[in-house]
Every structure is written in structure tokens, then in C-alpha cells.
Amino acid sequence: LRGWFVGEWRISIRKGICIDEWNVLMRDEAANGAVQEDMKARLTELNENEILLYLGYRGQEYPAEIRKQIERCEREVVTAAQPRLVWRRLPVDGELFSALHLEGKDIRELLEGCSEAVLMAVTLGQGIERLLAKSSVSNMADAVIMDACASTAIENVADNFEFDLRGEVEEEGKYLTDRFSPGYGDLPLFSQRQLCAALDTGRKIGLLLSPSLLMIPGKSVTAILGISDEPKALRKRGCESCSLFRS
């Protein structure tokens, strides 16, 4: 598997965490929270407006035949999707979370006042990759629309997990932040390595990283959320929440 990996620990080794120490931390589930598989990945009805946004529509009219094409492509994407989820809840003052070495002001702000963090990863599976590859050869217009549908679908799965988790956390009398992914704001993209390794995404849901940090399958999401005893204002979705946008 060299060249395709879940987590290559050069970064952590450079920061003083050797592989053996990391493996011990991973096994210490009592202190660091077991990898969870009790909550199912849910793909529900796709939001047509989101699909249109991915396609570049901003409220303008479009022909009936385009609508039919979108509906057909959406059905094919939903049929091909095999959503999978893995997540882990752990204390922010624990050794495992500290070993993640998450950098940046934005993630510190997100987790300020939080006693726990949730690491999550979701994917639509390889069936979507095959569908997109096939359509890119046979019908490029379909390929563009299917890509938009698949992007909407993976966000749908991530949103549904966040919704379900929020309900679970609120039953405990606690509060959940919104999710924050590597590459957002000033959280480096290389944090993907740490998240995928901590969640064992390769074995759990078939999610790997390329040497250039691209997720395989491509329609996948990793993210971090915080759990606090006090409510926290949720950030706006999109570029407005990014420190790079504000600077």
C-alpha cells in the first residue's frame, strides 16, 4: 500500500510522536474513545437548489429537458452511492487528541470551551467513482451533472450525521458546534492524515489518501466538531466563515 495511505506519520514523528507511541494511544479506547460504528450513514432526498448551485445556476431559468437530465442523473447517483460513516468522540485534553497536532487559529476558536471533540469521516464509496469515470467518457454533460449531484449527496450524508449527533449530544444536556474540515480557513490540509489515521478510515470505510492528500474515493468528507457545556454560535456555511476570506 505504499503510495496510498491512511496516515503517514512523518509529521507526527517530526513532532515527537513515534509510531509505537501512536499505536498505544489508538488502542487506549478507555482514555481516547472507541471508533464508533453505531450511527448509520444516511443519504436522504437531495436538495435540488444545492445541485443547481454546484452547476453554476443562481436563480435563472433553465429548460425542462435540463431538469429531466438532472433528475435522471440524480437517480443514478443515489443508486450508485454506498454511504459509509466512521466517527470517534474523545476528550480534547487526552493524549490522542493532543497527538493530532491540529494547527491554526480557526480550529482553536471552534474548540474553545469544548471538553470533547468528535472526529468524523463519511464517503459515498467507489461506486460513485466508477459512475463518474464512466460518464466522463460516454457523456460529459451527464458527468458534470452527476458530479454536482454527488457533491450534494456527500454533504447530505455529513449534514445528516451532524443532525443525528446534535440530537444525541443535546439529550446529554450538551451542545455541538458545527463541523470544520481540513483545508477550511487556516487548518492545514495535511490534517487529513491525522484524522484518517485516528479513525482508521482505510479499514473502516475504505477511505484512503493519495500522497497529494486527495481522498479516495473523492466524494468523501472528514471533519472535526466540538462538544461543550455551553451553547456556541454556529459559523456561517461557505466562504464567509473562512479566515482567508475575511483577511
Task: Report each predicted region and the residues it spans.
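Short terminal or interdomain "cap/linker" segment that borders an active site or interface and mediates
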Residues: 172-238, 244-247
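Conserved active-site and cofactor/substrate-binding residues in soluble primary-metabolism enzymes
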Residues: 65-68, 72, 149-152, 156, ...
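Long, amphipathic alpha-helical coupling/dimerization segments that relay conformational signals between
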Residues: 136-186
